[in-house]
């Protein structure tokens, strides 16, 4: 009986050991599957220069959230507030595949592609709906072809309107910038302002606050959104905003992606990105329309004087632009006249 009990105990022990090994093997297999699944998930890095309250961050977040909800093993990590690249240095790494996505004022890349300077041409865009039509026109297709040469594609189209600020006085017409140290966002605006005898200091909109504070700048123009995001109302005496009637300053600020990176994704991942981008683009247009009026309230609440551009002021700026920015663009860009004509043809 003792021998039998010993054998029974030995069998039970062996069975217990076998079960332990099976359980451990199962746990290891599940863990390995989890690691494999995580390894299959693709992470994309998206860079921009604004805070997480800015409309352009919100556009990026809509795309990131939409892709996450699609559950296609694709994650978009957003690096805002110029934490990954300096604002004017994002297009080149994007084109080289060192950066996956960015929300960028395209005229910042005018050094790489001079045609991009047309995306901030004074008086070219009439209003937000006109901007949306430009984004769907042969003119934009021509610009997208140039982006494709750099291995870049557009995911989300978007234009923002903007205005002027003066540190010590209001700016409505060309005579008001005579002798002022002024910031403009792109080459075409710089050329126009130089034609009005302003001195030009080039910088990203994220640098306007410090430049105003230290006396480097007397005046600046940028988008209504950036004026608020960067708290420029703390440094100026007067704000001339864009209105429904007169918006001299309209800037194309799309969400871009490296083309090869997009093409390397699965069909499900590509479709998820495009669906999220479509939703973000609709949001961008509707919110962009609200930014101008919202910025006026912020500046008013801060005690800043609000000035208005008259029809005569607008016409004077546009006449100056045609003699400076427009002529120089056509002279500097080989197909500049064709691109300008395509843009002007959009009703």
Question: How does the language model describe each region?
Answer:
Residues 15, 42-130, 139-347:
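N-terminal secretory/targeting leader peptides
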Residues 19-40:
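Gram-negative bacterial Sec-dependent N-terminal signal peptides
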Residues 1-18:
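Short, Lys/Arg-enriched N-terminal segments with co-localized hydrophobic residues
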Residues 9, 32-39, 222, 226:
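Residue-level recognition of conserved structural "scaffold" positions that shape functional pockets
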Residues 8-11, 26-27, 51:
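A periodicity- and composition-biased signal for non-globular, repetitive helical segments
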